[in-house]
Every structure is written in C-alpha cells, then in structure tokens.
Amino acid sequence: MNSPRKFAQPLLPFLRDGDGVTAFEACGLRVDFSRQRLTQDDLARLVDFANGLGLMEAHHAMVQGEIVNKSENRAALHTSLRSQDPASPHFDEVKEARDRAYAFAESVRSGKWTGCRGDTITDVINIGIGGSEVGPRAVYHASMGLPQPIKVHFLSGVDGVQLDRILYGLDPFRTLVVVSSKSFHTRETLVNASVVDEWLAAAGITGSSRDRHVIAVSANPDAYKDLRIPVENLYPLWDWVGGRFSVWGSIGIPDMIALGTDVFNQFLSGAYEMDRYVYDAPVAENISALLALIAFWNATRLNITLQCVLPYDERLRIFVSWEQQLEMESLGKTTRADGTVIVGNTGQAVWGGHGDESQHSFYQWLREGTRRTSIDLISCEKPGHSHEELHRVMIANARAQAEALVTRDPSMPWFNGVTTISISDLTPKTLGALMAMYEHKITMLGTLFGLNPFDQPGVEFGKK
C-alpha cells in the first residue's frame, strides 16, 4: 500500500492572520483581501516597494497625458473619455465627440433617425472584435434588467453560424449596422461588414438609402471612404486610447442607443469617481494598487500563474471575457518597456465563469488540483430580480465558497488566494467603477512588472 504523500512546506498564512486592515471600500465596492496568502509585513514591504518604484507617480503621469506607451510613442488617456474635469487632456475634443454620439443615439431612440423607408430602428448589429466588441457587450449584458427597447446583436468572429443566428428574423429596414474598428484594417470586421452589406443590398438597401443603416466608429479618418458612407456617419476614436480601454467612448454607441444616454452617463460617472479615488488614495489604502500588488506577489513570489474570475451574478457573465482581454492582452509579455527580457512570471492567465454554475464544473480542480490559483469572487448585495429566496441562496453560496476555496488539507502544498469583491447594488454607476478599478489594477501591474501594458505586438503579429 502506498503511504500518503507528505510535504515539508506548510500552508502559507492569510492576510487576515495579522492585525491590519484587510478590506477597503470605495465607489460602492467593498474589496476584501483577507484570504490572500501573505502577511501584514509582506504587504507593508510591497507597499514600500511600490512607493520606491514610483507607482503612483507613474499612474499620475498616465492620467496627465504623458507618453507612457513608449513603443508606439503615445499617451494612454482612456481616463479622459470619462473625465468631468475641464482641465483633463483633450477634454473639449472628447466632449464634442460624446455630444455628437449622444445626439445620434437619442435620435435613433426617439424615432427621429429612421431607416430609408421611414421605419423606426428596432435592432442594432455591432460589427467588431476584441475591444470593439467585448466591452460594449459586457456593458449591455450587465444592464439586462434595464429597459432596452432597441436590441443590440454583437457580430465578432467570421463564423457563419453566428452571423445566421443574428440575421435570422431581423428586418433590414429596421436595422442599424455599427462597424467598429480602431484601425479599420481588422480582417474579421471588414469581412463581416461586407457580408452584412450584401444582406442589406438583397433587400434593396443600396446607395444613399444605405446611409440610413450604416455608421462607423474608427480612429482611421478614411474609414468612411472604405465603407462608402458619408463622413458624418463616422464617429471618432483616437490613437491615445487602446481598443481594450475604449468602451467609454464612441465604441459604446450601441449601448448608448440601447440603454439611453442618461444610463451611459451614469456608467461614465462611476468610472470617473473611481478614477478620482485611485488618483488620490495612497498605495496602502488604494484598492486598485493593492489588487496590483497582490497579483504581483502571487505571480512573482508564489508562482501563481492563474487568475480565476467568478461573478455570482448573471449580469457579470460577459465581464469575465472583458477582464480576460484587458489583463492578458496588456500583461501577456516577456520584455520590458526598454526591450530587455523579463526573467520570471508576468501577467497571469485569466479565466472563469458564473460562480454558481462553476461550483459544479471546475471547482473540484480549484480545490484539489495541483495548480495554485488566485481567485476574484464577485457578488452583488442587491439582486437584479424579484426572487429573494434565489438571491439568498446565491449569496450564501458565494460566501461559503470564498472560504471553501482556500481550505486545504495541510499535507498538500497547493493553495489558492481569494479576494472577494462585493458590490452594494449593480447599477450603471457601480459597473463603471468596477471596470475602472480593474483597468487601474492592470496599468499599475505594468509598472510593477516593468512592461508596457498599452501595446499588443503579439496581436499585431497575428494579424499579418
């Protein structure tokens, strides 16, 4: 008979084992780090490291518009897309573009903008991939409890099954097509736009009639020529905003149409409140900075290369995909900003799923598998529905699993670290705060790793 395995390595302590603060609140979010695997002394040393490295100074430089994307010689000013401060970089330019997008969205919602025969628009097809799709889709899905008189359908990859499913039952005379691509060179987007154009043409929607059914969102000023639409049907992006950070601007036009500009403004407002908090809070009390520091610790000290995101709320199902792209495209790199090779781990592999469903699929692996995992468990205190008993069970599951996922047999050397994120009420405002919090975590991790989180050379190589 084989004897049980014995390991010399004891389980690491939890942050909660010390006397310091382990949870912080901001902008309707409560973030609890108590189940992460480090001591209060470890955390204090990490804070000192961040301060010595100039973490907050680097963050301030980004927000103020300095060239932080060194490889492309650009600023990274996604925060300007939601800023309410007239002194922020490009404020007037952003406001002008937003006002124009808002006016268009409201004209579609009110029925003032109609199809070529005078029919009101009932459906929007968003053609885009990556940052031009997953951000708006995450916002749209998270807002499923709000009135959505106009439906949005997201067409991303070149899978004809997806295309057929979207077009089935749609009336082309009541459909608006939004073609979104920062460069307007993304093959999947251009191919899909061509096929949908054929669908419109088959209904007789060509020439000037087509102008009532197709708009574009791009940083390429010639995109309207390529798409054969009037220049006034082109809405701008800028090269100082990366695609995965762009949901706050014109890329969000489908959400503006579906949800209304008042709702979209609340979304921007929540993000701006988080921006102000993160800008001002010291590292030791800054939830984005602490998320980044603990992720850095997990990756470089504990060799935890996996990050699992587990929302216990259907509305945040697509948020997992958004966070996956944000983190892996930003931090999946092996060289520093100066071109030298990084020795050791950088960004983690991000995956996850709806927490309640995942309990019956991969939680077995999380609990007893041979890989260490860092876990973000997200829940909402107020339900997005009227079924109180269902919500009570869901929240009980989330709280119990937060503890179960860090409970291990002491004879095993593998372990998890769990951060719980509790949202008081998932509204457009707190959704904006949540997404901005993660954005700041990622850009700060770029500083900690010494890499550029704003370029994507691997993606560009793949396009070739």
Descriptions of predicted regions:
Residues 146, 159, 167-464:
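A SIS-like phosphosugar-recognition module
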Residues 90-114, 139-141, 145-176:
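Glycine-rich oxoanion-binding loops at beta->alpha junctions
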Residues 2-117, 391-399, 403, 423:
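Extended, charge-enriched "interface" segments that sit outside catalytic cores
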Residues 122-127, 176-180:
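A short, small-residue-rich loop immediately preceding and capping a beta-strand
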